[in-house]
Amino acid sequence: MHLNPAEKEKLQIFLASELLLRRKARGLKLNYPEAVAIITSFIMEGARDGKTVAMLMEEGKHVLTRDDVMEGVPEMIDDIQAEATFPDGTKLVTVHNPIS
């Protein structure tokens, strides 16, 4: 399998997210990079599923809650930006205040 750097990065984010969702299911609280990876993967997969930028911007705010992450993490993440592939091309999706 031959992947370019962007494809490798997307695959790494997806794999990290799958591992981290298992940790979350076991009740472990997520740290900063773990929370960012899960929300980023949610955005990228949502785009592949045909969701719009507006939908992902809103739904991205409900992927994780304060109870899912370590203390202080919500305050560290003002917004998350992810480049996602939509049916009509690649777009930048920004989720403001993603952890409520």
Swiss-Prot record:
**Which EC numbers characterise this protein's activity in its record?**
3.5.1.5
Q: What is its main location?
A: cytoplasm
Recorded metabolic or biological pathway in which this protein acts: Nitrogen metabolism; urea degradation; CO(2) and NH(3) from urea (urease route): step 1/1
Tell me which GO cellular component terms the UniProt record holds.
cytoplasm
Q: Which InterPro entries match?
A: Urease_gamma (IPR012010), Urease_gamma/gamma-beta_su (IPR002026), Urease_gamma_sf (IPR036463), Urease_subunit (IPR050069)
Q: Which reaction does it catalyse?
A: urea + 2 H2O + H(+) = hydrogencarbonate + 2 NH4(+)
* Entry's family note: Belongs to the urease gamma subunit family.
Q: What is this protein called?
A: Urease subunit gamma
